[in-house]
Amino acid sequence: MTILHEEINFLKKDELNINLKCLDKKERYKIWRRIPKCELHCHLDLCFSLEFFLKCVRKYNLQPDLTDDEVVDYYLFKDKGKSLNEFIERSRRVTDIFINYDIIKDIAKNAVFNKYKEGVILIEFRYSPSYIAYKYNLCIDLIHKTIVEGINEAVEKLNHKIHVGLICIGETGISEESLRKAAEFCVKNKKDFVGFDHAGHERDLKPYKEIYDYVRENGIPLTIHAGEDLTLPNLNTIYSAIEVLKAKRIGHGIRVIESEDLINLIKKNDILLEICPISNLLLNNVKSMDTHPIKKLYDSGIKVSVNTDDPGMFLTEINDEYEELYLNLNFNLEDFMKMNLWALEKSFVKSEIKDKLKKLYF
């Protein structure tokens, strides 16, 4: 039996009193894997294994003069950096590997397989058509077709033991027209997308209200990257995401902790924050994991979920996030189950899928 067909003995409600303090790291990871995880914030275009990435670099002779370690340092972001802006510039280099549609399909398939192996039962992947097409001027319609085929093939091979939703990303870093085209692309393919997002450099999106209204009016809910970048002078990105764009969820949102007014606004609107702890640490948006605001946000009554963001860039997987939160902020299994139930309830996938998973695992 391969790991792709291995049955995971997911934790039940009456197993949450396991004494984690008696377990070593390897044993804890076995427990983390058994948590029925619902992940809402993971960039598909940056979700790959190191082995796969290096294989692509070598196959297409992208950096012939660099050793494997130097390739990692040039492209990826496994060590703490300076800022979100530095990360974005580094991630642009990764578009070197999006040479053809076969690679894109392999990324999609392997991402699903890897999430399943990590114990994820529901994953919402997000991707930017313009980001993938950027380097080699690929056709975004073919990119999308390839991604959907790759996901569907993987889910089928896994006998539908993992459920996948797809979110379209629009970016404002190039031009307003680029964002508008992404919105139109999302609406045109709304049978495949469960949501729409903004990513890239964090900014106040109030000037783009018309574009986001267009997406929402076509029945597509919004999740917006906001409250991530510690270098911004104010919290306007979060206020605009909630009050102007009417986002249902916020990507990151860790700076909500800076404002009692925002905490109350988030709770009033029942908005979930898609928290990505290791990402926040590596992008220098928190000083250390033990000072990460997720614990204070959780204790304040805000709904939060645990996510990997860009696991290919960070060389991480979802269970690393749980390990860090346990070691540094004393989260326990009951906390983790509650966060995953929130993530399931706030997912954009069809209600019948959510009802089925809730009955099975929660």
From Swiss-Prot:
GO molecular function, one term: metal ion binding
Co-factor note (free text): Binds 1 zinc ion per subunit.
Origin superkingdom: Eukaryota
Enzyme class: hydrolase
Presence of keyword Electron transport: no
Binding site for Zn(2+): 41, 43, 225, 309
Sections of the chain in a coiled coil: none
InterPro entries according to UniProt: A/AMP_deam_AS, A_deaminase_dom, Ado/ade_deaminase, Metal_Hydrolase
GO biological process, one term: purine ribonucleoside monophosphate biosynthetic process
Catalytically driven reaction(s): adenosine + H2O + H(+) = inosine + NH4(+)
EC number: 3.5.4.4
GO cellular component: cytosol; external side of plasma membrane
Family from the record: Belongs to the metallo-dependent hydrolases superfamily. Adenosine and AMP deaminases family.
NCBIfam families per UniProt: aden_deam
Record protein name field: Adenosine deaminase
Organism: Plasmodium gallinaceum
